[in-house]
Every structure is written in structure tokens, then in C-alpha cells.
Amino acid sequence: MIFTKTPLEGAFLIDLEPIGDERGFFARSFCRREFEAHGLNPDLAQCNISLNLRRGTLRGMHWQVAPHQEAKLVRCTRGAIHDVIIDLRQDSSTFTAHFSVDLTAAHRRMLYVPEGFAHGFLTLEDDTEVFYQMSEFFAPDAARGVRYDDPAFGIRWPREVLVVSDRDQSYPDWEPVAERGR
């Protein structure tokens, strides 16, 4: 695996190194030792799959607060997404900055999202599937979110948002979230 730092402290793009032959290829997509060598959280508590039927579907921006903060490893296994993370760690040099990248099934690139980051994505194709590996179990009482179009972050989505859940649409602006600790 090839680990590439993003502009956000602690977040990485991870590319596979396929070994191919006449059968196809073999590639490692997770290795505890390699994650530890790069200072990444190697714990695996839960894996999730998100199927998104329509292009323009938005999910996010989600995170969990302590003591249930989670790191995520995100990969698009069918279709394509525009993936976005926001650094919400107050002691970070990249606090409130965001990073985005297109992830597709074709290139198999993954995004490592550290604890304390909000995460979300917009589907770029119909029938898009996303696979997540999480370092922590889902804890409803620790779940938080900010709106995908919150002006505090200035995220530019590459296409119109056509489908978004009521929950994701109703998240408050960042300032009220920060003041409430939510």
C-alpha cells in the first residue's frame, strides 16, 4: 500500500499496489503493521456498506465525540463519490479546514479519516456503493453532524445535491455546534 499525506494533519490517501497475472490481481487493502508504521489507528470495530441508488445523493457531515471518536477507512466499491473531510480537532493546525477527493471503484483509492474529523460524500454516479471500516462502534449518543452546505466551511460540491436525509439537512451551523459541544 502507498500512503500519501493529505493537506489535513493525520489524514491519508491510500493506494493499493496490485500484483497482477493472467488471473487478474491480488492487493492488500489493510495491514495493521503498515497502519501503525504511519501512525494511523489500526483498530477495527465495525464495517459498513452504504448503497446509494441515485447520483447526487449526499451523506454527511458526520462524526462521533469522545469517548467514541472513530477513525474511518473509506473506499468506493462501485460507482464514484466526491468524498469530503473536515478537521474538527480544536488543537490541530488544520482545525476547520476541509479536504476533498474523488474516490471511484475503478481506481480503488481509499481515504483514511482520523478521529475528530467530520466525513461526508456526494455520489457522482447511480448505484454507488461505499465500504467503511471503523475503529469504534456506532454510538448514537456520541453521533454529531454539521450541514454539508454550512458556510463556515465553504465546501464546493461538484454537482447539485439531489437526495439528502432530513437528519443531514437539519444539522445546525458549526458555531451553535461548537458552543453546545455538539
Mark where each language-model region is.
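Non-catalytic, conserved peripheral segments adjacent to functional cores
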Residues: 1-107, 125-127, 134-182
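Conserved SET/PR-domain catalytic core that frames the SAM/AdoMet-binding pocket
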Residues: 104-121
